[in-house]
């Protein structure tokens, strides 16, 4: 049997594994508890499993826990962690921990090394695509960061397009929200996306986590200039798809709108944005652009962003301005990149 990584396996997958090893099905729940509740890092810790089973597991499996390789701490308390990919230690990806003064804490996790969506304003997009993360790589971020027990929210807003790696993201969402796993409410989790057609439809049909759609311009031609995927997944088609689903319950829909100075921050854009998303029960997160070396974009003035938000709210579209966090350590929105080698 080929070496298998236990972390990231769903209960069904663990059940198949223990049955292949000639063990009863209930051992799978015990194994899941050790992996996701007790967070074991070695098989020897799993003391309620028979020694014979532990021996079998050692011969065919590894746990798959991976420690943080590098930590950076921002002046505002944000922390950025570098992880190595389990099957390719030469490849790395980043995770961001964002504590709030009210006691909440959000973890921004990655789903790919780099990204193939190619957004022209994004440091991750400039990396190109270097591979999908495994379910073990993704759930390990949640389990292995220093403040894991303090987390109140997880957002798939790190490196990569989550719905381009849908199968893995779906497994992680199951583990995070199931009783055998972390037992989180889906409303504590948000998945961000540009809206790839197949992944978006599957997510809307199968998941109950919150959805955040990267919009950034209400005009297709202009959006295509900064987001080449507009040609593959037109925003109007994404809006049409979203309109088929109910967001009046616990699952929330939001639109991410990075505000660029002189590009998408005027009244014309605000009016078009209202018209585009008015049919949907949603909100808009306005995100100040974080300048990246070598890219031709700059941030909009705070007063301009505030006027933009005021207009949206006056038109009945709930809009908030996201506070920038971790900019001094390149941990803010759009700044994650591992092109530089480990120091």
What do the PLM-derived regions correspond to, one by one?
Residues 74, 110-111, 192, 214:
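Short linear Ser/Thr-Pro motifs
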Residues 1-93, 243-252, 257-343:
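Auxiliary Fe-S-binding modules of radical SAM enzymes
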Residues 79, 93, 105-109, 117, ...:
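Generic beta-strand structural signal
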Residues 97-98, 168:
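Residue-level structural signal for beta-strand termini and adjacent loop
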Residues 136-148:
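Ferredoxin-type iron-sulfur electron-transfer modules in oxidoreductases and energy-metabolism complexes
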Residues 145-153, 158-320:
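Conserved AdoMet/S-adenosylmethionine-binding subsite of the radical SAM
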Residues 99-137:
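Canonical Radical SAM [4Fe-4S] cluster-binding loop centered on the CxxxCxxC motif
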């Amino acid at each position: 049997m080929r070496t298998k990584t236990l972390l990231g396996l769903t209960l069904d997958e663990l059940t198949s594994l223990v049955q292949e090893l000639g063990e009863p099905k209930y051992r799978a729940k015990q194994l899941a508890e050790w992996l996701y509740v007790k967070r074991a890092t070695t098989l020897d810790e799993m003391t309620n499993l028979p020694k014979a089973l532990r021996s079998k597991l050692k011969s065919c499996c590894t746990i798959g826990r991976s420690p943080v390789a590098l930590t950076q701490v921002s002046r505002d308390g944000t922390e950025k962690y570098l992880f190595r990919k389990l099957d390719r230690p030469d490849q790395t990806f980043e995770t961001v921990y964002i504590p709030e003064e009210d006691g909440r804490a959000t973890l921004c996790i990655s789903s790919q090394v780099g990204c193939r969506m190619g957004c022209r304003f994004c440091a991750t997009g400039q990396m190109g695509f270097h591979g999908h993360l495994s379910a073990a790589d993704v759930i390990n971020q949640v389990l292995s960061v220093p403040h894991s027990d303090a987390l109140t929210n997880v957002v798939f807003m790190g490196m990569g397009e989550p719905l381009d790696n849908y199968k893995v993201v779906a497994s992680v969402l199951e583990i995070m929200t199931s009783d055998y796993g972390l037992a989180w409410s889906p409303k504590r989790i948000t998945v961000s996306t540009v809206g790839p057609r197949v992944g978006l439809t599957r997510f809307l049909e199968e998941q109950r986590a919150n959805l955040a759609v990267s919009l950034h311009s209400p005009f297709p031609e202009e959006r295509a200039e900064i987001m080449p995927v507009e040609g593959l997944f037109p925003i109007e088609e994404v809006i049409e798809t979203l309109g088929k689903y109910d967001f009046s319950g616990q699952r929330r829909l939001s639109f991410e709108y990075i505000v660029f100075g002189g590009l998408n921050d005027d009244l014309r854009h605000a009016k078009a944005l209202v018209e585009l998303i008015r049919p949907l029960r949603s909100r808009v997160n306005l995100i100040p652009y974080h300048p990246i070396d070598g890219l031709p974009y700059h941030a909009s003035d705070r007063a301009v962003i505030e006027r933009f938000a005021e207009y949206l709210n006056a038109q009945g579209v709930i809009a908030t301005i996201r506070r920038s966090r971790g900019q001094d350590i390149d941990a803010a929105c759009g700044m994650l990149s591992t092109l530089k080698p480990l120091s």
